[in-house]
């Protein structure tokens, strides 16, 4: 209408050259103009409509927005929404490609099938694969990928099922992308889904040479995996092959693997199964304890030494006192004591502990192929198991008692460092130095290290232990006697004497009767070998005098080269054999003739050495007996002065706590008590005096000795007797000695010990 009026208006306003127009003429003119204007408007509207229709055919803006919605529905696995959208869209929209923001952070052309395969949308995959317009092997995008490539590299939890659906629909497992990679070459799954990776490799076929990845399976959780055959390219395209592969994958057990770094072969690494590295000593005290000195990277599992941050690290059982019992807090990872913990941390500390290592037989025996085995493979490799503790480490009381027995067999007494070093092996140190009867000075000085209290440490010593004899000692041990005897006497006289059971925690240096009573009664009565009633009663007050008298007779027979007859006034003759056997058992000596060279077996390796040592001592004794009293006069006088010294005053108070003699014991017995050989004072010197050993093996027991004045005169004057006794001018031998004679006897005895020492040093 606007055009029509615009065309008519000029007509109405046009002048007629000054001539007026009539009404009829004007009406005719208006009708013609309207018709012309209407025709022109119709033509223009038709052209506009045609242009709009043409634009509608080529316009894709609205169509792209609708296709983006299809890709979103495919990623969300919304199969129902995708079905409704495809019904409104053209049939070809299901296989069209659109822009999708992918993993590489760029827009790539992807079809709804590719997006569904990437995210594992199984319902959408089934819907799209059912449409005839969808091509399962279509390539698109700059990378030329396919739906099978997207499913293999998507890493979705259901990627295996997605690959199975595509293979069942005819997807080509050998199709390559723009880079030449097959779907099997681009498999990508999270580390926790290693079983899915194995299944994808089996479904997509083995990788070709040059594009393969190394697969390492170290251990299986349930059972050993059987090899799974992969179908060929032709069989993989068939639905039957996919169904068979699905069944095989469902039957596969879950596999738990651990990656292990591969190291090149290092010939410089020691073989932990041979030579010294497989010995018990190294395994218990050095394996995974000593730090490794290699600065380069190598296999820790093949190296016997410890490395920084290694879980197999062990604490040295010689420095850290812990037991073989596993620590319950360490298993939970909350042990706060660290290296100070008294329990084992880890498997290596538990089974390589000296108390447990190789105390049991290995179930595989000699066919065991373990790199480090904690068990013995033959009976010869079994380490001894102590009954008292139930482990390979003896109890502190058992070790202390064994030390006393061996010291008694070697002529030593417990309490000196020498006696302990002579019986303990340098390669097997004890677990608890403070609890095995050694002096405190011998323990490791580590104030921050706790003391190990093994189970059974409070138990009594084992009944199965055996006392050592001379034939059980190596020949080299006899050379130690001369070096340690002087230290032994000093320790016995000046050091603190403590009980191995811990009952006597504090003792004075001066020995008094109360200390002696506690020492002998506590140690002997608590011992299992004296646990019966008849022998336990011997230490009652009523039997004390008889026991001390018999003890003096035994010591006199050991020390004095002159056979002296004592009057058994307060000793019951029927109790002598029992007391004698008891005393011999307490000293660890089975019989007086046990250490005689004649009693040593001919097959013993120390036969000749022992015979030579005792023969030399016998020669020294003969030399001593040939000396006259005038040669020993000044020495005896000096010895008498020593007895009156303040040091000897404490010795003179051994008879009773008050210092006065007990009238139940006569003067002679009191003198013998003061001469007790177990606590004799040594005036000086470094070499030992073992003359009592020769007396023990050569002379008969005191019960069978028959001594006469003629035998005494034949021997000659003795330094053990005062001049009034040795020259026959004094009282008889059976008469009791007065105070001066007792002092002279003790002084002469000390002088003889000095002379024995001097002669022994000259002879050696």
UniProtKB/Swiss-Prot annotation:
Entry-linked Pfam families: Ank_2, zf-CCCH, zf-CCCH_AtC3H23
Keywords: ANK repeat, DNA-binding, Metal-binding, Repeat, Zinc, Zinc-finger
GO biological process, one term: regulation of gene expression
Stretches annotated zinc finger (C3H1-type): 321-348
Biased composition (Low complexity): 640-659
A Gene Ontology molecular function term of the record: DNA binding
TM segment ranges: none
Xref: InterPro entries: Ankyrin_rpt, Ankyrin_rpt-contain_sf, Unkempt-like, Znf_CCCH
Region (Disordered): 616-665, 698-732
Biased composition (Polar residues): 705-716
ANK repeat placement: 108-138, 143-175
PANTHER family for this protein: UNKEMPT FAMILY MEMBER, ZINC FINGER CCCH DOMAIN-CONTAINING PROTEIN 24
Protein name, UniProt field: Zinc finger CCCH domain-containing protein 24
Organism name: Oryza sativa subsp. japonica (Rice)
